[in-house]
Amino acid sequence: MTAPHETMSFQAEVKQLLHLMIHSLYSNKEIFLRELVSNASDATDKLRFEAIANPSLLENDADLAIRIEADAKARTLTITDNGIGMSRDEAIHNLGTIARSGTKEFFQQLSGDQQKDAALIGQFGVGFYSAFIVADKVTVETRRAGLGAEDAVRWESTGDGEFTIDAIARNERGTTITLHLREGEDDFLSAWRLKGIIQKYSDHISLPIRMPKEVWDAESSTYQRTAEWESVNQASALWTRAKSDITDEQYTAFYQHIAHDNEAPLAWTHNRVEGRSEYTQLLYIPARAPFDLWDRNHKAGLKLYVKRVFIMDDADQLLPGYLRWVKGVVDSADLPLNVSRELLQESRDVKAIREGCTKRVLSMLETLADSEEEAERAKYTTFWQQFGQALKEGIGEDQANLERVAKLLRFASTHNDTAEQNVALAAYVGRMKEGQDKIYYVTADTWSAAKNSPHLEVFRKKGIEVLLLTDRVDEWMLSFLREFDGKELVSVARGDLDLGKLADEAEKAEQEKAEADWKDVVDRAKTVLDGKAKDVRVTLRLTASASCLVSDEGDMSGYLQRLLKQAGQKAPDAQPILELNPEHALVQKLRDLPEGDAFSDRVQVLFDQALLAEGGMLDDPAAYVQRVNKLLA
């Protein structure tokens, strides 16, 4: 037996969202109608889907529609759908809480800047709560399909932190939302204004949106409402129409509907595919990454329809994980209506759709990246800033398209004195020096650390460009991207670095002489660093720094070891190699020191400085400070 009346509190995040939304989204308040119509549309989609297995849920009322009615005297606006409806528990859960992963992290991103917060909140998806932008009280009456009339509920709130829920009787299946408008919001009581908003945002909704029909009364010179209802939208699925019949504004409105995003997309592609598998795809590239893109519970995937019947919201099997940010719709003519997620994983048709959608998305990105128009290339720059790290995952996830994905990658490099990732691998290859047969890169935690790495000194001396890689995904990506255009990708921090034709015979002879001259010092340094360094040697790769650490061939880099440890994973305990610059005063001083504390301290300082320069952490910072103080005294 359900309680007839209860007063309950909103989840803390809902209170915060209501406050921020009312203040941040007020300038674009008409979106409340778009959000409520979208919810009503989703409710009818869910009913259609559940009715496939249980036709009795339709309750002899298969004419699915949304009704919108304004009452000027009562100053109310009512949105009604005959979709799936809600039970008492569903109403409490859906209307009183935000059931999304990453919600707390989202609120931590809010800055207090009204314009920035408005974009974030719009991206988060305000949904039902947008009603409070224009209403000071909202009443929801709902009954879930399949439950009795006595199981209906009324949910009501003024948005002040609490809501009431009551048991009521309701014969009609579905949901009615009544907005009691705030003072000054009479604009939304105008049928003309409401129709304009619907046609702007919701014309593409695939079921009719109906309003009371009005006719011109010559005697009063006003429009008079009749008892008849009329559709005020086209009521046909946008993706089923011919591309030539759809405007850019309509494509944008549809994107905003399915993505719950206030911004326009960067690009879209709309195609009907025939052949082994027959389907229609409408895919969008968003302009902004969702706040929970990196949350493991992030709901990704396309809306899946079968013969225009909604099946599921987040069919993640239709695109690979690295394209999880793509929004859109796929309507298949071949899949069964009762398709399950398990069946999607095994279906040959789904595999064909996945391959087709992947190729279309990559083609869109290639078109933007290679465009002769600066505005289109600027869109790719925006895309890369938002989704570049996700796209890098494709190097490891999508071997079939590895070459295409590699051409889309962008990096910072020593060619430009900026942290902006705007260098393509093809552009790097085009600038390679005569005799250069490798693509060189350095990895670090930050752009500054990469730019100032001691490993770059010999490359600057020779005028060789080096890619500066600072994303956490880079080291993992490089384990799959071994070459590009026949050129091997090589870390400048490799101990066996071979500059090939870029190193002349005189340099090689000088290196051999230095190794012989410094053998005694190097052997003593090895003894000092036993257990910390795999080897010690002199190098000519340094021009300004006294020392650097490099990795032996086949060993994991120190940077990757640190990343794995930060992620709580085990990393091989590979010791680095210490390389010393024989021309540096700090190193030359070693020759004058006998074995003992002074020699040992200087060697330890040179090792620790090299570790710090590559972003590493000292095991004993206090001991390092004491040694440096001795040297300075």
From Swiss-Prot:
Annotated region described as B, given as residue ranges: 342-562
Transmembrane regions listed in the UniProt entry: none
Chief place where the protein resides: cytoplasm
Gene Ontology terms: cellular component: cytoplasm
SUPFAM superfamilies: ATPase domain of HSP90 chaperone/DNA topoisomerase II/histidine kinase, HSP90 C-terminal domain, Ribosomal protein S5 domain 2-like
Keywords, alphabetical: ATP-binding, Chaperone, Cytoplasm, Nucleotide-binding, Stress response
PANTHER family with a match to the protein in the record: HEAT SHOCK PROTEIN 90 FAMILY MEMBER
Subunit-level organization: Homodimer.
Name the record gives this protein: Chaperone protein HtpG
Lineage start: Bacteria, Pseudomonadati, Pseudomonadota, Betaproteobacteria, Burkholderiales
